[in-house]
Structures are given as structure tokens and as C-alpha cells.
Amino acid sequence: MKSFLLIALVLFFLFVSYASAKKKCQLPSDVGKGKASFTRYYYNEESGKCETFIYGGVGGNSNNFLTKEDCCRECAQGSC
């Protein structure tokens, strides 16, 4: 019985993590409020690809990745 509860708990946390990652990928790119000019990557749901945008350095949202590889790993399904 304890093994079943442990497995159920692990599956629940995996599902919650997956769902929150997908919500992140549905957000639009957000330059933030800063005045910096950093090249970052976001997942574009319309194109199904990770694309670049200029990030201001402050604020924004969680659809903001340092590398294309990070963006693809979290958001892209299939090739990126």
C-alpha cells in the first residue's frame, strides 16, 4: 500500500510539473521593463518554434530562455 501511494504521489508531481511547463510555453514574449538589450528565446505557439526576442532585463514572464536549446527542451515537441 505504501508503494502505491508513493508511486501515485510521484506521478502527481510529474503531471503538475509538466502542466506548469506547458503553461509557460503558451505565454507571449515579454520584453520586460528594463532598458537593457539581451537576446533571449521564447516559444512561439503559432510557429511551433523557439524564436529570438530582445529582453530588457527586468520583469517579463517565464517564457524567456537563455538558449534556444533550453527553449526547445522545455517547449518544442519534435524538432525545433
UniProtKB/Swiss-Prot annotation:
Record's keyword terms, sorted: Disulfide bond, Protease inhibitor, Secreted, Serine protease inhibitor, Signal
Pfam families, A to Z: Kunitz_BPTI
Transmembrane segments: none
Annotated BPTI/Kunitz inhibitor domain residues: 25-75
GO cellular component: extracellular region; extracellular space; host cell membrane
GO biological process terms on file: envenomation resulting in negative regulation of voltage-gated potassium channel activity in another organism
Remarks, miscellaneous: Negative results: has no effect on chymotrypsin and elastase. Shows weak inhibitory activity against mKv1.3/KCNA3 potassium channels (inhibits 50% of currents at 1 uM) (IC(50)=1.58 uM), Kv1.1/KCNA1 (inhibits 25% of currents at 1 uM), and Kv1.2/KCNA2 (1 uM inhibits 25% of currents).
Leader sequence segment: 1-21
Annotated protein name in UniProt: Kunitz-type serine protease inhibitor LmKTT-1a
Tissue specificity field: Expressed by the venom gland.
Keyword Signal applies: yes
Keyword Disulfide bond (UniProt): yes
